[in-house]
């Protein structure tokens, strides 16, 4: 289990007591809580111990909760949106097969912004011809070459922004990736750049669901990279932590 801090008091005494409760040096305690909250203070906490730790931190004025990282939803649990249809204030999300999934504005409880980074590695083999001096001497000065194979690993990093539409009507959450959706539904507002189109899509969603807050913590620098390694994808874990914090009004 993870022990998560969603808000921390500024009182130095409370923070000193919090470091003692977590059995951490004060400097390490402060470092783990630096940056955008919520932050994971402790990982791999025993199930029978995490509840007492949450209670202890709450008594010191911290907003704390526990989290099972294996419960974090992934894209396998979400609707991947390929197109959107809007008519008379009603919206339908279309999947890759063209199936319509009705979605009224009131059913959106939260819109999260994020960036998913995908790294791909490929082994590249090249063949070079080199002058074989030894064989050239043996053949009386004839130019003799030999083949040498060289392997290198080429790594490519791809960043793609997305919008996570979280629903409160029992239907699966939906995710809109910047470069995986057909933006023709924007009509005259469609722009040449995908990033600009994603921003216009967000603007339309906010107009349809004015009561749904927009949270960009997962997209902020250092938020996802500051999470501990778990069995869940770091971006999915970050989205889940923000969701849990939001349900607590944080």
Predicted regions and their residues:
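Phosphoinositide-dependent membrane-docking surfaces
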Residues: 89-94, 99-120
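Surface-exposed, interaction-prone regions with an acidic/low-complexity signature
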Residues: 1-8, 59-65
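Contiguous mid-protein beta-loop-alpha structural module that forms a pocket-lining wall or clamp
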Residues: 13-39, 51
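Anionic N-terminal interaction surfaces
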Residues: 43-85
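Mixed-charge, low-complexity intrinsically disordered segments
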Residues: 117-153
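Short, surface-exposed beta-strand/loop "edge" segments at domain boundaries and coil↔beta transitions
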Residues: 10-13, 48-51, 97-103, 169-177
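Solvent-exposed beta-strand motifs enriched in subsets of small alpha/beta binding domains
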Residues: 2-8, 36-46
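Extended, charged low-complexity segments
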Residues: 139, 144-250
